[in-house]
Amino acid sequence: MQVTDTTVNQVVAEVFSTMLGIEASPIPSSALAHEGTWIASCIHVTGSCAGSIVVQVPEPFGRRAAAAMFASEPSALSNGEIKDALGEVANMIAGALRLALPMPNAISLPSVAEGRDLSMRVPGCEVVLETWFSAQGYEFQVTLLNRLPGK
């Protein structure tokens, strides 16, 4: 994958602003461990390049983001609605980022996982870019992975 942190920063800020009305600002890095409950949305890229795009957010922020998407109160949302919303956020980010990748390429449907002390791993891939953002007092992560040759 050949996407820069500048491209990721622009795409994430635009998706959060346009879809959710939430300002997401890049931060240099985070010492924040994935403690507590996190939600991870993963989109796979295939074609001229192969890899994955993973968006990981703390559950309370995921609930707020979903509430913004559905114009609802955070407490009124089911876990399924929160996962659907975060899958769609990852889909929008991946859809925009794929345009910066060699063509032809395609993206998968999102896979969404939730768990305590969650750490997402995609076998056969290496991290090529890890970016952190701050929004509404929370920090979240967007990671790009490249499929290793022969994997």
Residue ranges of each PLM-predicted region?
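N-terminal auxiliary interaction/assembly segments of multi-subunit proteins
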Residues: M1-K151
